[in-house]
Structures are given as structure tokens and as C-alpha cells.
Amino acid sequence: MTTDSTTYDAIVVGSGISGGWAAKELTEKGLRVLLLERGRNVEHIKDYVNATKGPWEYLHRGRRTVSMEEKYQVLRRDLLNETNLAYWVNEQDSPYTETKRYDWFRAYQVGGRSLVWGRQSYRWSDFDFTANARDGIAVDWPIRYEELAPWYDHVERHAGISGSREGLAQLPDGQFQPPMALNCGEELVAERLKKGFGGNRRLIIGRTANATRALEGRTACQYRDACWLGCIFGGYFSTQSSTLPAAMKTGRLTLKPWSIVTEILYDKEQRKASGVRVIDAVTEQTIDYSAKIVFVCASALNSAWLLMRSATDVWPEGLGSSSGELGHNVMDHHFRVGAAGRIEGLEDKAIEGRRPNGIYVPRYRNLFGDKRSYLRGFGYQGGAGRSDWSRAVAELGIGAAAKEEAATPGAWRFGATAFGETLPNHANHIALDHTRKDKWGLPVLKMDCALGENERLMRKDMANDMAEMLEHCGLKDISTYDAEYFPGAGIHEMGTARMGRDPKTSVLNAHNQVWDAKNVFVTDGACMTSSACQNPSLTYMAITARAADFAVAELKRGNL
């Protein structure tokens, strides 16, 4: 084991959305920061090796193979294909245990999942931050929308969020770039939807981290809809396109990939962290790094893993475990349920371009006097389009008629899937599995999570409501679906180290400090006290920027 002689002002663990923001904010405020990433380096532009490839340029035309399915037993459940396989974790090196099925899609590299995320970016409202207190569920959030609003402003301006201003109380407007346009099928549904349901159900363009105007070092989105390959234009927000260049520009950032942080070092006399211990993923050498503050941004489950691994005789269950809530209250957004139908009257219309964005129907259930048999609610994401030539292949036709059928655009269809809020539940938890180790001899995580009765009741409305809306809008051949969903599949894992007002019932305080060690901050999905139904990444960004501002101020005051 070796010890690095440098004492940094801050160490940031993880380089995804939250870690990138922590590095940017801390360095720009004058701190010398060490950014540790357990996976490989991915250089912006240079390493997006498939960004301009067509399907014909892949050995398997971009599709999955039997050998891929054998190697990627988790990824095969949904996301497996040839085009961006390099961005996903090696499952043999980094396994996990499922007491109950949990679909954990991980991306261990500089940038993390910011390279492959869906980019939908929505603010939460006070309906969300007051929900637990209002419903008597779990614990109250220690912050409110008013406290986070200026930080939403801050991160939206830098990230480049495009969207429309709608004046909706449940979905606050932000500092938007010009919105992308709805297509004619979506406009038809949006206009007809306004005239029904008391005006409470709205269809808007998605709010997405695809820039519609150029930003520093970034070109506006080119409408290629190939974001998951990495964008050589910097058209969407990622660590590589946005926060990492800003942090590097300060000259105060040190980036170390291939650095697996195995524990936070705790000074019992000072009652705070002194640094972290790292295994070099390539050489397997152990190195200790020192810092005045530590930001844990390794993603919700891995951040909890790190806190659990940081056990001492003071905290035998891990740093932050004094409340008994560390590793508990795992949440995700349940989805794969909705409806679709055929639009008539637009046969002379077509779509131009490949807009990398869909529509959004904001939450309306259990709001504005509505009361259901379940708590909370859901929003819809989807879109309208025309089927293409591939629909004709199944007919196996021949001759002129078959050619004409393949050359003619198909019917217009509209479909949407709902994303529903999951309630925090102490029984949904993760733990260290000391009987199973990864490639580096470290214990893996054991998952024990399931949907509850509230989510099951909600899913009925998630399917039927969209069918009802499409019928109101005049669509035909409407069908609903409720496909099998397992926790984790939404890739919005949250909880495990929740914020709260009381150290007896939460892991973090209102500023994301671990109650048990005030110079350790957790600002990724682990900190979330409830899950809302909106995509959470924008809220991670705002929470991280707010916590970094507080941490620097406290450090300067000598309080850390």
C-alpha cells in the first residue's frame, strides 16, 4: 500500500452526472480537486468510435448476438446491442446478487451514464418536496423547492435544457433554450387533449438536455437521434461535453480513472473523514488519498456500497449507518405500461429529421382535488410517428404491389408509456454480500427490492388513462399494455442514504452532509427522500451544485 503525499481540498468519487457537477463547482470556487473514477477514461469526441457509423458498418449490423447474451446476462434484459456495448459494465468482473430480481444497468467509465442517459430534464415542485410530510410516508424532505430553484436555474443554463414554458404548478418552468417542435400527430393530440378533462391533462414537448442553441465548446443538437453512441458535436449534456471541460479549464482538477474507491478513511478523534482508500483497477495496487472534504457521487447503489464499506468500530455497519437507514428505501420509476393508437387524417403529412426527444404529459393524478385509491402519480413519455417500409417485410410480398407498399409511408400512430412514482419503503434495501466477491476481491451488493401495493394500484390508471385520452382525441385501434417491470429497469435508482431533518431517521442533513461525518457529502441519487415521477437527473445536478456551494463556504469558515 502507498500513500499519496498530496492533500487535496476535495475528493469527488464518481464522474457521472453528479460527480461531474461536483468537480466543476468545487474547482470553479477555488478548490484543488481529485476526481476518482473506477472505470476507463473516455475522451470527448476521440473515443466516440461508433458515433458516425451506420448499421451496415457493424459486424452484426448493430444487433445483439448469442455470445453477447451469454456474457451480459443483465444487459440482455433490455439494452443489449452491438452499437454501444463498450459503455456498459463488464458483468463478469462486477457481478451482484439478486435476492429478488433487480435490473442494474451500470456504466463504469469517465462520464458514467451521462454518456448514455435519456436526457429528459424536469424540475420537481413543492408537490414533490412536501409529499412525504403530507402523506405521512417515510420522513420529510429537509428542503423545499424555493431553496433549490436558484440552483435549478444555475445548472439549466450551463447544461443547456430545451423546453417550453407552460406555467404548470406541478412542473415548474426553467431557464430553457428554445423548445424542439411537436410533429403534426403530436400537435393533433395536444390540441384535442386541451379541450377535455377539465384542462388538467396537457401534452408538451419533452424538456431535454439537448441544446437547441450552441454553448461554449458545444454545437447545437444535429437531430441525429444517435445520442447513445456519444455525440461528437457536444449536442447533449454529458460530463465530457460540459462539466469536465469547465473543471479542467480551472487548472485545479486531477482526474484519475481506473481508481476503485473501496472505503472512506475516518478519523475518530476528529470525527470526520481524512480521505479515501483506492484500488488501482489495473495494477491492483492500494493507494490512500487525503482531502479536507469528500463528495460521494458514485450513483445511488454504489455510493451506499462505499458508505457500508467504510465501517469502523465507531460505525460497524458503515459510515452514515447510525440511523439504521443506510442502504434502505431503494426507489426507481416503474414503467412499461401505457397505450397506443392510430391517428386518422394525416396521411398527407410526413416527418423530417430525427428529433432526439419525445412528448411529456405531466402528472395530474392526486393533484388539484383529484383523489385516487393510491398515493402520488405518474407522467407519460412517448410520441407520434409513421411506420416505415419495414412493416411490409412480414408480408413477404413480391412484385410491383409489394414495392409500392414498401415505398409508401404507413399509418400515423401515437404511443406513450407512463413513469410512476415509487414510495420509499424501508423493506426495499441493499446490503453487502460477503459470500460473493468481484474481480478485485470486494464484496458485491445484494438486492432485495419489489413493487408495493401502491405501485400496483397505480399501474391500472397508467394504462387506462392513456387509452381514455387517446379515445377522447379520436384515435382508432387503441390498445393498452402492461409489460413486466422489475425494480432498477427505469435506471432512476434513488434512496439508500436519504436526506432528512433528524439523524435518528436519515443518513444526510439538509446540505447533504453525512450526519456521522460532516465533511462527507452525498449528492447523487442516494440522497433522495422520495422519488416523484419526473426524471431525477436535473435534481441531482441542482442538489450537487447547492451542496458544493455550502461545502466551500463552510471550508472557508473553518467548519470542516
Report each predicted region and the residues it spans.
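Aromatic-residue-lined binding/catalytic grooves and analogous aromatic/hydrophobic interfacial grooves
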Residues: 20, 234, 239, 355, ...
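Conserved redox-cofactor binding core of oxidoreductases
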Residues: 59-66, 70-103, 108-109, 118-123, ...
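Glycine-rich loop(s) and the adjacent beta-strand/alpha-helix scaffold that form part
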Residues: 28, 32, 37-57, 250, ...
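N-terminal glycine-rich phosphate/pyrophosphate-binding loop and immediately adjacent elements
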Residues: 2-132, 137, 142, 146, ...
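Short, glycine/acidic-rich hinge or "gate" loops at secondary-structure transitions
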Residues: 44-47, 162-174, 476-485, 557-560
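A glycine-rich dinucleotide-binding beta-alpha-beta segment and adjacent secondary-structure elements
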Residues: 204-211, 220-227, 262-265, 411-422, ...
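FAD cofactor-binding and catalytic pocket of flavoenzymes
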Residues: 85-106, 110-113, 117-118, 123, ...
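A conserved FAD-binding loop/helix module that cradles the flavin
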Residues: 530-548
